[in-house]
Structures are given as structure tokens and as C-alpha cells.
Amino acid sequence: MLITLSISCKRDTDIVDPTPVVNPGQPTTPATGAVTPVAAPEGAAITAIIGPAGGTIESADKRIQVQIPAGALTTSQTISVQPLGQNNCPAGSGQAFRLTPHGLTFAKPATVTFQYTSKDVNGTAPELLRVAYQTDKGSWQSPSVKGLDTTARTVSIQTTHFSDWGLFKSMYISPDQSFVNPGGSQQLRVFQTGKPLVEGDELFVPLPTLVDTKYIEKWSLAGAGTLAHQHNTGDYYAPETIPATNPVSVTVFLNKTETIDGKVYKDLRLVTSIFVAPEGVSIQIGAGGAWQTFPGGANINSTQNIILGKTGDTFAMVGWVGKPTGVYQWTAGTTVSFVSQNGPTMTYSHLYGKNVSGGSLQVNNEHETWVVGTFTLTSSGWIESVPPPKYGTTSIRGVFRVKRV
């Protein structure tokens, strides 16, 4: 999920089209299971010999765990867990795994537990995650969820056989995160992957369709811009300038509950984040100053991470040592730093003499295409090198949306 810099917050009035239309998401026939390719393995398998006494096996990254109870097996078996290159389940989220041997039937159900990440629930909610397996015909089926632990971030089901397994979103807003230019727009849609015809039955996982509008309670926008929505679709319109809060968020409140292991979950919401910034590195010098945007890129590595935007002899750069996603305070050295050259004579820094500016750098490196973030300096030191040199401090805001180089 993207990191938010909260300088100020503005909530614009939603724009709702009152004209009734036929709901494009209203299902007319029962959904059937979607057939997808079988994914190739990726990485080494973890194996364990488990016999009649039962046992546990988990993946190297602990994203999946299988607990086989005593009495489930009559003889010792070599059980393996192997990550797959793709999660091909419709609306799949996160890593998929191959559990073998296929064709083995347990006398008692085994428990399969997936650990989800914050990225896995982008655009959905933990209560709406489900687990599915791929059949020998290529379709996907989902047993009912037997356990949800939102503290440990785990979802569990029970099964009497092995196959290829993965998480998927039973209901979600798409895209779950997006990036638009100031003045641009983003189309939003709410999808579902169906419900079992009989409670407790396995769900044949179909291709996602627009959600039945009876499940939509309302839409809400937090941040600058405007939101037009109708039933299960919406459109976000970004402000003409870089907003004070990035990203903005759109929330769809659902008119439904989920019951998992006897517990009823209410107040379900789907949230998508929208990062509003031009491609490149943008800075605003002084309160109310004009934004300047420079083309640039990100060099993310284990030694020193750099975000640099440059046009001619004018540039802006932030650097930090540490994880590629996080929140960092400026330091006296170059561990977390900012420098900008504005023409041949004007230089800005996160330092003013020995004083370190207040503010912070916030970076998100989780998206496959973009590295995005924001930064503030409450008292950036500046020097004008034209004789006689002049010195001072000013505030600086920055935002970046760049690709890795």
C-alpha cells in the first residue's frame, strides 16, 4: 500500500449521477469456473516426510503452511511445497504454491494456511480473501474459509487433497492502486468472483464480473479532486496541481457481511489509492511556490538508494541508506539526504550549517513499474554563490513518480 504524506486534507463533494440505468453488474446466470493455464514452478521445493502421527510443513518464506493431523495418513509420505511463477487463479493475489503429491487423499482434513501481506489486500479486505485450488481440468475451486486472523494476517481452509493453491480476492475495487497526472482521471470498477450456491459448498471460481449493486452502500473520496460514481463504477478526476496529500484514496463501503468460523464481519470496505503527480521529480520551494518537475529515475540498491531528477544544470536528488520502502528522517550526514541545484548559482540542502532540517522522506518501492514518494523540508539550507554569497533557509515540498534505472 502506498505511503501518505499528510500536510493537509481536503474532502471534495462526491458527484453522483441521479439518472437510473440498468446495472451492468447484475448477474443473469450462475457463474462457472474459469479455466486457466497451469503455472510453472519457481524456486526449490521444501520437502518433509510425514506419517500417521501427522506433522507440519511450510514454505521457505512462511507464506503457506500445511498441518496434517494424526490419522490423516496411513503410511509415511514425502510431502512437498513449491512456489509457482504465477498465481493464475481469477483475481489471484500474492504467491501461489504447488502442494504434492497430487492424487493423495487424506482420511482427515489437513489445514492449509496462507499468510497475506498488505499488498495482497490492496483494493480488498482481509475478510474478502479466499483460498482456491486448481483442478486437473484447469478450473479453480474454493473451499469455505475456516479461519481468519487479522493480527497474524492468515487465512485458513481445510482440504483432503493436494493441488496448486493460491489466494484470491472475492470482491475488490480495480485498479487497487493507480498513478495519474494532475488534471488526469482514473476509471474505477468494483468486481466480484461469485458466491457458492449453497452456504458451505465449494465455490467454482469464475472470471470476475462487476459486483451486484445490492452490495454497494456508498462511495467516498479522501483528498483533493472529485469523484463521480454510479452503482459499481466510478471515475476519479485529479486536481490541476499536485495535491497536498498523496496519495488520495477512494473507499467503497459494502452492504454485506462475511461469516467466518461463526464470527460475523461487518463494515467491509474496499480502498484504492491514487497517486497524483507527473512522472519525474517535482519540488516546490517556499510556501506557495511554483512546482518544478524534472525527468528522472530511481537507483535502488543495497548500498545507497538515489532518486534523481535533472534538466540541464538544475536538479533535485534524495538519497537514503536502508530498505527501499519506508519513512526516513533527514540526517547530519548522507545517510538520508536532499540536495538541489537551481541553476548555476543556487543550491539547497537538508542541512543549514550543522543544523538538520525537520521533515521526512517517504518512499514506496512496491509497485512493479513506479517508485513513488513524497518529502518535506521545514528549514532547507540554501546558498546563493554569486559574490557576495548569501545564505538562508526555506521550506521545500517534493514528490516523485519515477521508474527504476
Predicted regions: what is each one?
Residues 105-110:
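Extended extracellular/luminal ectodomain segments enriched in beta-structured repeat modules
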Residues 64, 95-97, 334, 357-361, ...:
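One face of beta-strands
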Residues 43, 112-118, 398:
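Catalytic cores of nucleotide-enabled group-transfer and carboxylate-activating enzymes in metabolic
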Residues 280-285, 346-349, 381-391:
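Flexible, membrane-facing loop/turn or short amphipathic-helix motifs
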Residues 5-8:
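C-terminal motif of bacterial Sec signal peptides marking the signal peptidase cleavage site
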Residues 282-284, 288-370:
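Surface-exposed helix/loop patches within compact recognition domains
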Residues 12-65, 72-76, 89, 103-104, ...:
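Proteolytic cleavage junctions
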Residues 172, 376-405:
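Edge beta-strand at a domain terminus
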